[in-house]
Swiss-Prot record:
One of its GO terms (molecular function) is ATP binding. SMART domains: AAA. ATP binds at residues 40-47. It comes from Methanocaldococcus jannaschii (strain ATCC 43067 / DSM 2661 / JAL-1 / JCM 10045 / NBRC 100440) (Methanococcus jannaschii). The lineage of its organism: Archaea, Methanobacteriati, Methanobacteriota, Methanomada group, Methanococci. This is Magnesium-chelatase subunit ChlI homolog. InterPro entries: AAA+_ATPase (IPR003593), CHLI-like (IPR045006), ChlI/MoxR_AAA_lid (IPR041628), Mg_chelatse_chII-like_cat_dom (IPR000523), P-loop_NTPase (IPR027417). Pfam families: AAA_lid_2 (PF17863), Mg_chelatase (PF01078). Belongs to the Mg-chelatase subunits D/I family.
């Protein structure tokens, strides 16, 4: 008899709205580049990550593929051959959280390769690593700041390209590796280098709840869940289903979302004004703003989408002094947004005036 294991529902997490939003946006568009969650222990970081995996819809995979290949997307060499022969069978499975141990070696992460066998058999000679297991799942790194920098680079390269590439003695093997990357850390235990910080799409600082009612609600919900997980899960089932459907619809809408040239120029202008050198910042803001628009059921990006995206994508890319926490110059950002809105309103008024003039001219003809 199989015992059902219930995960604490995502929609039952009290507070931490910014963290939850950052996770949802990455679920809508993994190309955002993951999220770094900074905060002390006991602030629902790992609970939210596991709850997200349980919340997300099932994925379609190639049956028996060690890399969870998407039958409608990028395929490994084995699946390509199966597709050519018309033997590509598919199945569905739940997404899962793949944990990366702090002491993981490079071989454990990217996989091990038998060179002699690889020359003859190609990808079949690969002993899959964590990046194979993580493909189309959630890769979770707790205490990412304690991980070896080289391992972080390997992970972030794979996350950016969507492929894990293994090169040994002139032999090159690759397989799809696109995942939702989530790193958590306690800043009191050490910071990440700016070069590494920049590679994470979004960053969120989480703190303990300071509202008495919220803290009491957490106690009640955790006790209720521990006492009867099934009943508690069913209590939030409707909310879970609604959020799941909203994410599915946002994914479908994402490619239809457009952003105006005015907003693109504004994003780049803000990044320059704030002294952010990397172009990755601009690109991440655009991708995040589009995901926000899709999440809100729109096919166009607004200035409010851009503002919210900047609050998630820019703080960790700001220049700062040693031991100074990452933070965004909110006053400067607010000022620039107000200036943009005023200019936009002025431009719209001028357009309306020109329209009125054209109407009058046509009436006089």
């Amino acid at each position: 008899m199989m015992i059902m294991q219930y995960i604490y529902p995502f929609t039952a997490i009290v507070g931490q709205e910014k963290m939850k939003k950052a996770l949802i946006l990455n679920a809508i568009n993994p190309k955002i580049g993951g999220v770094l969650i900074r905060g002390e222990k006991g602030t629902a970081k790992s609970t939210a990550v596991r709850a997200l995996a349980d919340l997300l819809p099932e994925i379609e995979i190639v049956e028996g593929c060690p890399f969870n290949c998407d039958p409608n997307g990028n395929l490994c060499d084995i699946c390509k051959e199966k597709k050519k022969r018309g033997e590509l069978k598919t199945t569905k499975k739940k997404m899962k959280v793949v944990n990366l141990p702090i002491g993981a070696t490079e071989d454990r992460v990217i996989g091990t390769l038998d060179i002699e066998k690889a020359i003859k058999e190609g990808i079949k000679a690969l002993e899959p690593g964590i990046l194979a297991e993580a493909n189309r799942n959630i890769l979770y790194i707790d205490e990412v700041n304690l991980l070896d920098d080289h391992i972080i680079d390997v992970l972030l390269d794979a996350a950016a390209m969507g492929w894990n590439i293994i090169e040994r003695e002139g032999v090159k093997i690759k397989h799809p590796s696109r995942f939702i990357l989530v790193g958590t850390m306690n800043p009191e235990e050490g910071e990440l280098r700016p070069q590494i910080l920049d590679r994470f799409g979004l960053m969120v600082d989480v703190e303990g709840l300071n509202d008495v009612k919220d803290r009491v609600e957490v106690i009640k919900r955790v006790e209720e869940f521990n006492e009867n997980p099934e009943a508690f899960y069913k209590k939030f089932e409707e909310e879970q289903n609604k959020l799941r459907e909203r994410i599915i619809k946002a994914r479908e809408l994402l490619n239809k979302v457009e952003i105006s040239d005015d907003l693109l120029e504004f994003i780049s202008k803000v990044c320059i004004e704030l002294g952010i050198q990397t172009n990755r910042a601009d690109i991440t803001v655009v991708r995040t703003a589009k995901a926000l628009a899709a999440y809100n059921g729109r096919t166009y990006v607004t200035i409010d989408d851009v503002k919210e995206a900047m609050e998630l994508a820019l703080p960790h890319r700001m220049r700062r002094k040693p031991f100074e926490p990452p933070q965004l110059n909110k006053e400067k950002l607010e000022q620039m947004i107000n200036e943009f809105k005023q200019q936009n309103n002025k431009d719209n008024e001028e357009k309306e005036e020109h329209k009125d003039d054209d109407v009058k001219k046509n009436m006089m003809k």
